[in-house]
């Protein structure tokens, strides 16, 4: 099992494992208790009636951090034990390591989270042992290129979602195995997004976001729903992302990480997750013994990948006014093969032309969420997937599963071997996504 995850980049979903029900019950009851401590018994009662997936109805986004502070220290020993038993289930016989950094991922629906204040925590922020916290604060490293606020377009941190990445790009260890555990039912559009087959592909991160740089086309994303209690186990070097939570429910998951061997870090990231528990200590009940593997002493030379330059679809620049109704000739039809894309600078607007087997479509070229270039996203006959957070846009209408995020569409026609387009009828499309 372990080698297929590590060597082939596959993933598996565990539906039944040791300590699963006991720790799930503990995690859920700690969340209910935390809500009661923060907002009183009436809020707890309301949450018990409505279900945890409606947590955002009783908790403000600004209280996600305080709730984590209440839940994680008590949950930590039981969680470490459960993670350790999963390591054994995966077939690791010898001593292995469990990351001290664990995350209670609370992703409110995007439309709720985007109204939060700046002080509300990012869903991807974890918690560590108290001793680790003090040491990490003392040795914090800052990279001047890294600017997550700019990537997230200054949206409140509670609304942030991870773009496509490998975990070693963000300071995690080599040869890790990620555990991602559904504390409540997780619908597909609030889940993880995977790009199978990308384990050994040549991709580069953008140094400003540590997510995939522009110019690397992605394969079809795999999205998966999980039932309450199911555990996704995957190789974090396969490109993966967080789906923008376009549902009306809060996503609740806990993530942890195993390293079958002593953790080592990539030279490509400026910091490293240095604090770990050994399976020997966890199995002996020593949950507060944390080992430190200092980055500088545990670096591994970068994997020798050829540096592949980014590849962008052809760009055609047209003089145009997007407010008039005039048709403009773009280029010869043969410039876009079936399944291909072409970028057009239409006056001062960026447009993406996409050819399916049936027809040509023209849409705005950047995602209405954070402006990421859609040219790298996979498309099929009906949909274009954003390469950042997996959102699917209908190629006919531009609609997505989020009412606030819709692509502007352009009219496009082929006449006697040429492609023509114009920017009209923007409000007249009524096709369902
Ligand atoms: S940038 Fe987030 S879904 Fe496109
Ligand atoms: Fe990740």
Task: Place the predicted regions along the sequence by residue.
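Short cysteine clusters
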Residues: 367, 386-389
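Catalytic core of non-heme Fe(II) oxygenases with the double-stranded beta-helix
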Residues: 158-224
């Amino acid at each position: 099992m372990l080698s297929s995850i590590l060597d082939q980049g596959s993933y598996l979903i565990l539906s039944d494992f040791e300590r699963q029900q006991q720790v799930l019950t503990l995690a859920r009851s700690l969340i209910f208790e935390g809500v009661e401590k923060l907002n009183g018994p009436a809020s707890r009662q309301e949450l018990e009636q409505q279900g945890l997936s409606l947590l955002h109805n009783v908790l403000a986004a600004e209280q996600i951090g305080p709730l984590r502070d209440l839940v994680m220290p008590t949950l930590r020993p039981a969680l470490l034990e459960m993670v350790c038993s999963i390591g054994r289930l995966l077939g690791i016989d010898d001593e292995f390591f469990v990351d001290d950094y664990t995350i209670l991922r609370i992703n409110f629906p995007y439309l709720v989270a985007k109204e939060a204040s700046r002080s509300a925590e990012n869903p991807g922020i974890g918690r560590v042992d108290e001793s680790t916290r003090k040491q990490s604060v003392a040795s914090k490293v800052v990279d001047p290129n890294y600017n997550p606020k700019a990537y997230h377009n200054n949206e409140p941190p509670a609304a942030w979602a991870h773009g496509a990445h490998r975990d070693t790009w963000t300071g995690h260890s080599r040869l890790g195995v990620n555990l991602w555990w559904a504390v409540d039912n997780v619908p597909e559009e609030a889940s993880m997004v995977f790009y199978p087959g990308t384990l050994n592909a040549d991709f580069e991160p953008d140094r400003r976001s540590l997510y995939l740089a522009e110019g690397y086309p992605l394969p079809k994303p795999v999205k998966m729903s999980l039932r309450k209690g199911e555990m996704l186990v995957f190789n974090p070097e396969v490109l993966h992302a967080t789906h923008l939570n376009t549902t009306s429910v809060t996503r609740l998951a806990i993530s942890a990480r195993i390293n079958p061997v002593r953790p080592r870090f990539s030279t490509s990231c400026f910091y490293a997750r240095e604090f770990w528990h050994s399976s020997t200590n966890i199995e002996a009940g020593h949950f507060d013994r944390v080992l430190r593997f200092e980055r500088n002493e545990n670096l591994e030379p970068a994997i020798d990948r050829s540096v592949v330059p980014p590849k962008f679809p052809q760009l055609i620049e047209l003089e145009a006014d997007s407010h008039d109704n005039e048709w403009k000739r773009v280029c010869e039809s043969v410039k876009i093969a079936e399944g291909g894309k072409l970028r057009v600078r239409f006056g001062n607007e960026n447009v993406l032309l996409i050819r399916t087997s049936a027809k040509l479509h023209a849409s705005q070229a950047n995602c209405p969420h954070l402006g990421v270039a859609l040219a790298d996203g996979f498309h099929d006959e009906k949909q274009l997937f954003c390469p950042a957070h997996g959102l699917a846009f209908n190629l006919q209408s531009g609609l997505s599963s989020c009412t606030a995020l819709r692509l502007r569409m352009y009219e496009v026609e082929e006449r006697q071997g040429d492609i023509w387009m114009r920017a009209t009828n923007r409000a007249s499309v009524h096709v369902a996504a």
